[in-house]
Design a protein with these regions (language model features):
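N-terminal nucleotide-binding beta1-loop-alpha1 segment
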Residues: 9-13
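Short, solvent-exposed loop/turn and secondary-structure capping segments
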Residues: 20-21, 68
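Short, well-ordered beta-to-alpha junction loops that form the rim of enzyme active sites
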Residues: 58-61, 138
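A short alpha/beta connector and helix-capping loop motif
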Residues: 4, 22-48, 52-57
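Active-site-adjacent betaalpha module
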Residues: 1-7, 43-51, 68-69, 76-215
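Short glycine/proline- and charge-enriched loop/turn segments
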Residues: 22-29, 73-81
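Short acidic, Gly/Ser-rich segments with clustered Asp/Glu that frequently serve as metal-coordination loops
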Residues: 14-19
Length: 215
């Protein structure tokens, strides 16, 4: 067992992105396999809690009128200007119920793809003495990959739970996983491949980091 202290980071698994009735699926921006990824992430959350590993949820949340959304995003994707979801305090912005996110859980709100940018995430992780991250969530090739890269550049070793992630298409998901793996930005693990002493396995069956061993 290595000496890393892990946290599980669940990125943006919110109703607005993942649930069929969420604001993004309603405008044709649904994610392939989203609810399956949520179900797998719920397993990961349960495993982490059982091992006393901190679980941190991020939410992509905007103020009323979305003044903090960003001009570049609206310019490149004007259809998003009409999306009224992801407002704080709404069902759309809430974490998917399957994840069991409670009011006293660790939740970091963000307004950019990178969960570290302009947020309290890094001080929170340092305060918890976290030295390595498991990451899962949506969208694989956008917020998940951006956050994984940012974590790597901050010297957090990253393990991506690939079967707990989803993207617009499975191909985009796979390409993102390949990029993170090929450039050694993250180890790739799987919750559904099985566990040995609480450790997720890679798709090949070779054990990766002991991310679910007791902290």
């Amino acid at each position: 067992m290595d000496s890393e202290r892990y946290a599980l980071l669940v990125v943006d698994m919110q109703n607005g992105f993942c649930h069929p009735e969420g604001s993004f699926p309603r405008i044709g921006r649904g994610l392939e396999g989203a609810m399956e990824a949520v179900a797998n992430a719920a397993v990961a959350v349960g495993q982490a809690r059982a091992a006393a590993i901190p679980v941190v949820f991020t939410r992509h949340v905007y103020r009323p009128g979305r003044p903090d959304e960003g001009a570049a995003l609206i310019r490149n994707s004007p259809e998003l200007a009409g999306v009224s979801g992801l407002a704080d305090g709404t069902w759309d912005a809430d974490a998917c119920a399957e994840l069991g996110c409670a009011p006293d859980d660790l939740v970091v709100d963000k307004v950019r793809f990178d969960a570290f940018q302009w947020t309290s995430l890094e001080p929170l992780l340092r305060g918890l003495d976290v030295t390595a991250l498991m990451i899962c969530g949506v969208v694989t090739n956008i917020c998940v990959e951006t956050t994984a890269r940012s974590a790597f550049m901050r010297d957090f070793p990253v393990t991506l739970l690939a079967d707990c992630c989803a993207a617009k298409t499975h191909r985009l998901h796979e390409l993102s996983v390949e990029v993170l793996s090929s450039y050694e930005l993250a180890e790739i693990a799987s919750v559904t491949a099985g566990f040995d002493a609480g450790r997720p396995q890679s798709a090949t069956g070779r054990l990766k980091s002991p991310v679910f061993a007791s902290a």
